[in-house]
Amino acid sequence: MPSRHGPAAAGLLALLSAACAPTLGAYRFESVDLVAREAIAAPNDFEPITAPYRAYLRVHFSSDANLNTLAETREAIDARADLCPLDDPTGVVVLGPYAVGQALAIRARMPDGVAAPGLARVLERDENGRYAYTAYVVPARTAGGPPYDLLEEPQDLCLRLDATGGAAGAERSNVFVAPAEAIRAAVAAGSR
């Protein structure tokens, strides 16, 4: 059905839709588990995280996007997390993204005392033809910002990747969700 506003309006709508599209790719939640601080360094080939947290929620996610390729033209790519919706003022603490079993070229902005990923490597697709990534979420905070406790009160966790320093300015991925039910199951399995 032709637009009653003509081809110019249709072209403008297509341009605006493209501008709103995620430029860092689309990511899909895969799973979440509760891990001790010591379990973080080995699978990611970078220096151990020395942040003072005893445990993390390790969020597994995947994409068709190769973050090493995207990182070639960007200053930094960071994971962002919050209680859903993503603009919740809580500001959940998250480290990443990291490639599963592989180091990323990206240098995410890291808190003091936390090491960034090591040297770049060629990322390989998993058995499903996707790139596998992780982010490490601090499951509870009682000071230094609004408090939250995903161990005692699991909630849906919204995540997104943000980039800076690219030709297009600030860029982002889609928002993907680690459901409260998956977090609850991870906490129960990690508590055994």
Regions found by a protein language model. Give the residues of each.
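Bacterial signal peptide processing site
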Residues: 21-23
